[in-house]
Amino acid sequence: MAKTVGITRRSLLKGATGLVASTIGLPCVVPSSSLGKAGSVGPGSKIVMGSIGMGGQGTHNTKAFLGNPGVRVVAVCDVVEARRQKAKHLVDQHYGDQECAAYNDFRDLLARDDIDAVLIATQDHWHALIAVAAAQAGKDIYCEKPMGVAVLEGRAIRDTVRRYGRVLQTGTQQRSDQKFRFACELARNRYLGEIHRVKVGAPGPTYKRTYRKPVTEEPIPPGLDYDMYIGPAPMKPYNGGRLAWPDWYLIWDYCAGFIANWGVHHLDIANWGCPVLCKEPAEVECRGSYRNDGLTDNINDWQAELSYTGGLRMTFTDTGNPNKQGCRFEGEKGWVHVNRRGIWAEPASLLKIKIKPNETHLGDSNNHHANFINSVRTRHDPIAPVEAGHKASYLGLICEIACRLERKLRWDPAKGEFVDDPEANQLLARPMRSPWHL
């Protein structure tokens, strides 16, 4: 059970008192939260949003929401002044005014009662703290994957979202791609027969550091709130590589690596098509190597296998080691392989199947952002709900733990912990730098 997040900031500006000052001069947009009954949203009202984390992915997502006529973006937040001012300009230019607020501290944005929903696209080590605080503040959430950098962080997000009755869409947008859904529907409706193996491949060693300067302490550049950037992670001397992409993906303090970050995309599809992966106990084995260049230290390459009592196996490797990019379901009647480039099957006739009306259908979203906005209005779960994000995230994280400990582990999904293994269970959480805590 998640405790109240360590937010303070006068407890999100003490509600209304701080909100008066923060909302002066805002555009005349009635928040959807003030309309409708029992949490419902009128079809003509706009969903008022704020974006937290304005790097590449945050900008991409914000542009998608700007393109939705049922949304009004009123605030952006980033610890880098140049980024937040650029984001403010993007929003203001879109609406033709100067009304977008730009914040350094996400707590100031969350304290506004006119905001219905938030985008979270920060570095991974911030996801849990901000998502939990957002749910507690009554906001719906579009959260980039993964659900934190530790299993218990994802659990805290899940529990808090449900306790406060919020909508959360995980940024696993492959669920809004018809070919991924079709592959999963073939598996779920037993067109492949009994599934005996799932193969997942995700990027890993192909990503290299882009910040080429020496790994030495550098002056903190003007306009960067470095203390806020570090947040709950251990404080380390500033080096530009700590903010560069994909460099921060490769640093343990801010991310669990591609095994648990990018891997979430295809692990999510694996679990969507074969839900037993997160329902039954599994033995988890993983071997691999870690980066070690004085700055980056995350897992570089890996070969993991999860074994289930009924004979099902899932192998999860970095791309080409040996699994191909994507997700492959293998059954007694054939196989289907899907990734962002396409879908393949053996026999090929599987691809001509039409899922019958009385069979399992996995939704019809073709726009991940629009699906989220529709869920905010209807209060129904989106296509990638919080539970799905948590499960896909922890599959990668438990493989990383097995690799780090260099031994086989036994995972109990009902308890959400390893069996009779205190050392492994300690790694389900990460310590947070004071004053931050979950």
Language model features by range: what are they?
Residues 14-43, 374-438:
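C-terminal helix-rich "cap/oligomerization" subdomain common to oxidoreductases
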Residues 294, 298, 302, 307-366:
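NAD(P)-dinucleotide binding in Rossmann-like oxidoreductases
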Residues 140, 148-225:
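A contiguous active-site-proximal alpha/beta segment in oxidoreductase catalytic domains
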Residues 54-61, 336-411:
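C-terminal structured subdomain/cap of oxidoreductase catalytic cores
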Residues 170-172, 216, 253-260, 288-293, ...:
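Active-site rim elements
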Residues 53, 190-209, 221, 225-236, ...:
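NAD(P)-dependent dehydrogenases' Rossmann-like dinucleotide-binding region
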Residues 2-143, 152-167:
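N-terminal glycine-/serine-/threonine-rich beta1-alpha1-beta2 phosphate-ribose binding loop
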Residues 227-309:
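Rossmann-like dinucleotide-binding domain that binds NAD(P)(H)
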